[in-house]
Amino acid sequence: MKIGYLGPVGSYSYEAAQKYKKEEDELKESKTIEKVISSLENDAIDICIVPLENAIHGAVVDTMDTILENKDINIIDEIVLDVHHMLMSKTKDSTIAKIYSHSQALEQCKTYLNENFADVEKIPVSSTSYAASLAQKESDTACICNEICKDLYGLEIVSDNIQDIKDNKTRFILLSKSKNSRETKKTSIVFSTKDEPGALYKILGMFSIAEINLTKIESRPAKTKLGDYIFFVDLEGDEKNEKIKLTLANIANYCDEFRILGSY
């Protein structure tokens, strides 16, 4: 099986993919989240692993927006990864004039960076491992990445565990063009409400009446007009469960757009 991930080698997505893959599986990297999911759409890979949310900085909007644009993909599993950020450079004693990392990592380490490198340029790039590759090549440069990158890119640790909270975690989802056949514990849906008073309230009330527990609700701009939103919801239970199936069917009647992203 071919598994796609956000590369290059050494990224947190790579780390998550390593935890999931079996010995016979092949990992295939892409430079952006959009390209990872596009590879799945084009059948270049069988599944892909992408970050969805972080304990400090919240949703990974690139993933959410790309899922909205690709209607034929399903969430089939999730991996929660402990994330311990480290500041690295070619040598410990080098002067640091700029720091590369993924935008999420820069935000997750904001307190440390403000206290120690307030005047240093912070440059967001496509992944933490790509940041490590840049720090390997450039002088007066550091990166924020994971411990895997130390040996992969020949870097030295300047400071470790620099994230704002020590119990930092990122949730990754596995995407496939096939649905899950096994029994599952969680279902993700996405919907937009009709333009009428109390539409969202009515939908949330249906979950309450059916005693279905919601574990997450997140909104994204619908990109139609100001004030229009798409809602991502995680709920406990399998979409094949009769109570959940009936509730979701009723909710769909109150939506302009409704889609089950998958059970896992």
Q: What does each model-identified segment do?
A:
Residues 1-264:
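Domain-level signature for soluble enzymes in the chorismate/prephenate branch of the shikimate pathway
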